[in-house]
């Protein structure tokens, strides 16, 4: 779907009025380009596609950066996100003595950490408008019947790498409560490459708008 359709669908389905997009062009938009993550990896083809569309955005007037001292600790974010995700996914599973249930105190402790992380992200967005990252570290990979994510692996730049850590890319936005949009910006060996466009809390329409502009640049 195109960005206009995404924006319309959001307006039609949102239970509250969403703020309008802050950006109608890329001129002056402050974009943090994040091609590395301390908890996972991305193939060189993915990172090259990310840099290429970022360079085109800069030519259109965007202001690029590649780091910020205000960024939260992404390794800790991934650790706590995996904890919460595992708990959520196990709620309907049979009891497992190897993985005892978490207590209410510990769960609220995780919620406190999540809320603190969301505040840290908001401070980071004082200095940037948009963050772009890989969605996943590779293009589409061969199907596997292995049900255990921890036993799966990927080939990244010719070397075996763990599959399960790839959720660190999308986990940043999910755990931090930020809107993100996946958008195609290139291809490698005939397979599409997407990037993730992350915006501040409640700026869903801004994420959609910038994603659409980046997609148009990549297509051009």
Positions of predicted regions on the chain:
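Charged, often glycine-rich, active-site loop that binds/positions anionic groups
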Residues: 76-91
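Glycine-rich, small-residue loops and helix-cap segments
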Residues: 106-220
């Amino acid at each position: 779907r195109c960005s206009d359709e995404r924006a319309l669908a959001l307006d039609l389905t949102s239970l509250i009025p969403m703020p309008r997009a802050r950006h109608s062009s890329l001129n002056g938009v402050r974009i943090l380009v994040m091609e590395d993550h301390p908890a996972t990896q991305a193939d060189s083809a993915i990172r090259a596609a990310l840099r290429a569309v970022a360079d085109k955005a800069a030519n259109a007037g965007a202001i690029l950066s590649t780091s910020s001292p205000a960024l939260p600790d992404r390794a800790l974010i991934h650790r706590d996100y995996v904890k919460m995700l595992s708990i959520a996914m196990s709620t309907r599973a049979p009891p497992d003595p190897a993985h005892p249930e978490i207590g209410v105190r510990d769960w609220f402790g995780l919620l406190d950490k999540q809320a603190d992380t969301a505040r840290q992200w908001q401070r980071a967005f004082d200095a940037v408008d948009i963050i772009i990252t890989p969605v996943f570290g590779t293009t589409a990979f061969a199907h596997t019947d292995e049900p255990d994510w921890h036993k799966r692996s990927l080939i990244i730049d010719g070397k075996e790498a763990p599959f399960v850590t790839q959720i660190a890319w999308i986990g940043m936005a999910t755990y931090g409560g930020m809107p993100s949009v996946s958008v195609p910006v290139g291809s490698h060996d005939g397979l599409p490459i997407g990037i993730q466009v992350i915006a501040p809390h409640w700026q869903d329409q801004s994420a959609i708008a910038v994603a659409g502009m980046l997609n148009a640049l990549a297509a051009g």
